[in-house]
Amino acid sequence: MAKPLSKGGILVKKVLIAGAVGTAVLFGTLSSGIPGLPAADAQVAKAASELPNGIGGRVYLNSTGAVFTAKIVLPETVKNNDSVSTPYIYSGFRATSGTEADIGLQYSKQYNVWKPLMKVGSKNEETYIEGKDKFTYNKGFRPGSTVQMTIYKNLSGNTRMTLWGTNNDGYTGRIITEIQGTNIGTISKWKTLATAAVSYESQRDAIKATFSTSFNNITIDNKAVTPVVDTQDFAKVSVAGNNVTISVNK
């Protein structure tokens, strides 16, 4: 797993993380511009036992639907006692075309908040439609809070994420971001992950991260979907109905 980009406190490369998260976490290959996140699906078999460029847990959602929703319960506390890894909590999908999307949240140790992140294939330049000033820079979603996530694979040719929750100032509202011009067609499967990602595989042994999160009431196209456990790499993944808890500990 690679280390996705950073926003606000962690330097936001706007090259956000879809690929980063996905790249580092799921596969051994890094996406362009985003350290630590998986990029393509070529090394899926390897990822099933270990997440290259990081550690964590992953589940797949066997649905080809277009709209993903879930309530994410953020960790009350995050122990990230190293200088090389970044915690991520995210969802996303793999298209039949091979495009991998990583969409969710990245932890800022500097501000103790969770910030939005997106990457779809080679595209990682986000467009903010609403809420940028409330959930980026030195602001983000408050630890221990619940965030309502909605992902649209293709909305007028763009991939969009909406996150609704409470920031570190106590403001409750939403942020809407999208990657434009993705033109996603058929989906192969969806996914959810919690990872601690690094930029290089050689940094894996130095990771010291402990946190736990849940994706509750997971639906795709308004239908409940039961997660299928794929990877537990220094992580415990527990599924109950259309809910999953991922606890990372190293």
Swiss-Prot record:
Q: Which UniProt keywords apply?
A: Secreted, Signal
GO CC field: extracellular region
Signal peptide span per the entry?
Answer: 1-47
Where does the UniProt annotation locate this protein?
Secreted
| A Pfam match | YrpD
Highest taxon of the lineage: Bacteria
- Say which family it is in: To B.subtilis YrpD.
Q: Which protein is depicted? A: Uncharacterized protein YncM
Task: Record the organism.
Answer: Bacillus subtilis (strain 168)
Q: From the UniProt record, report the name of the gene that encodes this protein.
A: yncM
